A protein has these predicted regions:
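Bacterial N-terminal signal peptides
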Residues: 1-9
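Pepsin/retropepsin-fold aspartyl endopeptidases
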Residues: 11-277
């Protein structure tokens, strides 16, 4: 996969940037998708929980001119852990944050059929997010390639994990505490909610809430689920308070909520999240 990282402007090398849009717990940025003679610009979801980019199946065929017969069948994992049959294809070009990527592998999924009106047309997965350090400045709505000036207030280092069946690669796993209990945390910016095993918070006040939930294995539905509010959460040396949906899964899941009011650099090469002062 070839990419162009920087442009030269007036003799100076200028890092590329893109607008960043927050919508509840999600972060979006514009990308330009090119396939054959067709070109589309869409608002794409930034998703650290996806190993590969994902394109909605209807959008891929109707708007980007993909040939359904040319798609390759494979399996991937839903957020629930279920093994799900999908397809894959190669998008000729993706321009993401001023960087043009060639021959980008994408999973082709019926996003609109599963997530309904919440579904994006395109999801930016780790195969693009990991190509270069990205500075995410949510307060000012900018996404920039590379680091930014300023001291690091906190550095969060992560580990990765790959599934034996190849359906999941890389991934960001952090060490932390939720409610004072040690836990391994999966950073999934495509998760609508923060989640933690209910057994870690046996005495915490909880309430039942009706929340919309879906993944690529099941259609969107409103479920009545237990929620704990304002739970003290520590990731590395960074401490905050977050709301959690209670589950029976062993790993906690955090989206970008805990970094919402910060400027941070996501660096896959160094396996670091550098929170700036």
């Amino acid at each position: 996969m070839w990419c162009l990282l920087f442009v030269v402007n007036g003799g100076q090398v200028v890092a590329q940037s893109s607008p960043l849009y927050a919508d509840q717990s999600y972060l979006y940025t514009p990308v330009r998708l090119s396939h054959g003679d067709l070109e589309r610009t869409v608002r794409a979801l930034i998703d650290t929980g996806c190993s590969f980019c994902v394109i909605d199946s209807t959008f891929a065929i109707d708007s980007c001119g993909w040939d359904r017969a040319a798609l390759a069948p494979l399996h991937t994992r839903a957020a629930s852990g279920a093994r799900v049959p999908v397809h894959s294809g190669v998008l000729e070009r993706v321009n993401f944050c001023g960087t043009t990527f060639i021959a980008v592998k994408c999973l082709v999924v019926d996003l609109k059929g599963k997530f309904l009106h919440y579904a994006p047309n395109f999801i930016i997965g780790e195969n693009l997010l990991s190509a270069q350090p990205l500075c995410i400045d949510a307060p000012n709505g900018r996404l920039t390639v590379g680091d930014v000036p300023g001291e690091n207030a906190t550095v969060l280092r992560w580990q990765t994990r790959e599934s034996r069946d190849g359906t999941f690669t890389k991934g960001i796993f952090l060490k932390g505490r939720v409610g004072g209990k040690k836990v391994r945390i999966f950073l999934d910016s495509g998760s609508r909610y923060n989640k933690v095993n209910a057994a870690l918070l046996p005495d915490a006040p909880r309430e039942l809430m009706e929340l919309p939930q879906a993944d690529i294995s099941r259609r969107l539905e409103v479920l009545r689920v237990p929620v704990c509010r304002a739970v003290e959460t520590q990731v590395g040396d960074y401490t905050t308070r977050l709301n959690f949906v209670l589950t029976d899964r062993p790993d906690a899941v955090l989206n970008f909520d805990f970094l919402r009011n910060t400027v941070f650099v996501l660096d896959y090469d160094r396996r670091e999240i550098r929170i700036k002062q």
